[in-house]
């Protein structure tokens, strides 16, 4: 019998949402995504000690200034983990820009160039890397510049149709619209606690974004992210890509129920609307309280995990 994971791989590129190298070996994803929270949890694993030590040695050799050493060690550690993962996936690794730069266009551009340079120095070409950037207006503008330089971006923490539209209009390579965190918000802010997969507000959001992109012929890849259960995943079968954490990959691998394609746009490609202005972006994005709260919360959480990572590295510098 075919497992649901194998069936899903026939219609969707499956990506592992983890920094755990053992999981890569087990589930054989095409790509992998990391973020500050995943780097933090991965850095606690014993097999990563040498990667941390290497990042610390690199930072000490590069600068005598403690603050600069911390920044350099943090960037090098993220790349070191990415390099290990790239030995196991045939496709791309997503490495995230410091979330504290989420509202800083130039800062994001410079950090992305630095991450790319570290990968290039290790012999990895740009076409195996995605730079993850939060889907703020500033992050989207930074990604627009980076894409023109041949640096492909993964726009993350995406919760609103406004964010999705602005990303497509900026020509970004890939977006990561979140599913589970949208469901979390609706559960926390209403009496309804149970949702059938087709009624899940996160599933509905990604479905709408997928159809919008195909309707207007945008090439930006839609990669659903942040899943709470396999029902959300199977309801998005056919999405360009889905990034899935190891526990859910395990469930899909152990499940042999038939899997039908759910996302497929068969209509005509239509004439695109004029690009959104900054004012239109903020008006539309801020009209959705879920998107506003979840974007801000996501940035805060990633920033907090970066600070924990820095504390761990600072103790070694």
From Swiss-Prot:
Pathway(s): Carbohydrate degradation; pentose phosphate pathway; D-glyceraldehyde 3-phosphate and beta-D-fructose 6-phosphate from D-ribose 5-phosphate and D-xylulose 5-phosphate (non-oxidative stage): step 2/3
**What GO biological process terms are annotated to this protein in UniProt?**
carbohydrate metabolic process; pentose-phosphate shunt
Its predominant location is cytoplasm
Q: What is the lineage of its organism?
A: Bacteria, Pseudomonadati, Pseudomonadota, Gammaproteobacteria, Pasteurellales
InterPro entries (alphabetical): Aldolase_TIM, TAL/FSA, Transaldolase_1, Transaldolase_AS
Disulfide-bonded cysteines: none
**Keyword line:** Cytoplasm, Pentose shunt, Schiff base, Transferase
User: What is stated as this protein's family in its record?
Assistant: Belongs to the transaldolase family. Type 1 subfamily.
Q: Where in the cell is it found?
A: Cytoplasm
Q: Where are the active-site residues found?
A: 132 (schiff-base intermediate with substrate)
CC terms in the record's Gene Ontology section: cytosol
Gene transcribed to yield this protein: tal
Any idea what this protein is called? Transaldolase
This enzyme catalyses: D-sedoheptulose 7-phosphate + D-glyceraldehyde 3-phosphate = D-erythrose 4-phosphate + beta-D-fructose 6-phosphate
**Per its UniProt record, what PANTHER family does this chain match?**
TRANSALDOLASE (PTHR10683:SF18)
Q: Look up the coiled coil feature and give its residue ranges.
A: none
Q: Which NCBIfam families match?
A: PRK12346.1 (NF009001), talAB (TIGR00874)
Q: What is its EC number?
A: 2.2.1.2
The record, for CDD domains, names: Transaldolase_TalAB (cd00957)
Q: How does it assemble?
A: Homodimer.
Write out the function statement from the record: Transaldolase is important for the balance of metabolites in the pentose-phosphate pathway.
One annotated GO molecular function is: transaldolase activity
Pfam families according to UniProt? TAL_FSA
């Amino acid at each position: 019998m075919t497992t649901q994971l194998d069936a899903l791989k026939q219609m969707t590129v499956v990506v592992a949402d983890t920094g755990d190298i053992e999981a890569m070996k087990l589930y054989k994803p095409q790509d992998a995504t990391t973020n500050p929270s995943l780097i933090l949890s991965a850095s606690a694993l014993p097999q990563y000690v040498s990667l941390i030590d290497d990042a610390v040695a690199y930072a000490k050799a590069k600068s005598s200034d403690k603050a600069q050493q911390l920044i350099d060690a943090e960037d090098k550690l993220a790349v070191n983990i990415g390099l290990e993962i790239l030995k196991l996936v045939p496709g791309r690794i997503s490495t995230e820009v410091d979330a504290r730069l989420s509202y800083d266009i130039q800062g994001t551009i410079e950090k992305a160039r630095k991450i790319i340079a570290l990968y290039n120095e290790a012999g990895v070409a740009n076409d195996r890397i995605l730079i993850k950037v939060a889907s703020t207006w500033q992050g989207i503008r930074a990604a627009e510049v980076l894409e023109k330089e041949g640096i492909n971006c993964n726009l993350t923490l995406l919760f609103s149709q406004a964010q999705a539209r602005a990303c497509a209009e900026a020509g970004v390579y890939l977006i990561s619209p979140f599913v589970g965190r949208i469901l979390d918000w609706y559960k926390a802010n209403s009496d309804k606690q149970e949702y059938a997969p087709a009624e899940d507000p996160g599933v509905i959001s990604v479905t709408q974004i997928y159809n919008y992109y195909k309707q207007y012929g945008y090439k930006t890849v839609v990669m659903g992210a942040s899943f709470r259960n396999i029902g959300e995943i199977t309801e998005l079968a056919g999405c360009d890509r889905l990034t899935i954490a190891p526990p859910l990959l395990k469930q899909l691998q152990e499940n042999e129920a038939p899997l039908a394609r759910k996302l497929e746009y068969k209509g005509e490609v239509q004439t695109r609307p004029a690009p959104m202005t900054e004012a239109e972006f903020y008006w539309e994005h801020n009209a959705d309280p879920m998107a506003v709260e979840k974007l801000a919360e996501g940035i805060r959480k990633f920033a907090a995990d970066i600070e924990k990572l820095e504390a761990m590295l600072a103790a070694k510098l």
